[in-house]
């Protein structure tokens, strides 16, 4: 996977969703692409069968392309949830089919770059991982 592919996809999302500041609003981005976003707790009340499928698949987040639902575990740290949500958006942006390790790496790289692009880290004058985590809510 080329860095240029990840950067180009990130810039496309920023432009299409008019992202102008950080931290990005993850749920707003997902809604822009037509997803309904629920916590696992909300999903359990709404559709227990889908909730059980989510829990069997991932403890972090789950995307159901058939229903247009993305759910995430509200009990995880907020930064982890944000990463998981943008990871799922990465699968959408790259039209991934299946869970190959390549697809997972690509979605991870996309999520990282979207949440805290290198250039934004530079211009935010981050001097430590703690600075990055604080400014970009990771």
Give the role of each language-model region.
Residues 1-138:
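Active-site hotspot residues in diverse enzymes, especially metal/ion-binding acidic/histidine motifs
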């Amino acid at each position: 996977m080329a860095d240029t592919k990840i950067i180009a996809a990130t810039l496309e999302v920023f432009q299409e969703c008019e992202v102008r500041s950080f931290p990005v609003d993850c749920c707003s981005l997902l809604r822009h692409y037509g997803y309904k976003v629920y916590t696992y707790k909300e999903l359990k009340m709404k559709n227990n069968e889908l909730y059980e499928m989510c829990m069997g698949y991932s403890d972090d987040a789950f995307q159901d392309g058939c229903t247009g639902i993305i759910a995430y575990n509200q009990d995880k740290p907020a930064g982890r949830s944000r990463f998981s949500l943008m990871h799922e958006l990465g699968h959408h942006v790259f039209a991934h089919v299946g869970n190959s390790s390549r697809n997972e790496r690509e979605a991870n790289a996309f999520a990282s770059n979207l949440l805290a692009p290198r250039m934004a880290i530079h211009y935010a004058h981050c001097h430590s991982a703690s600075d990055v985590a604080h400014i970009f809510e990771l």
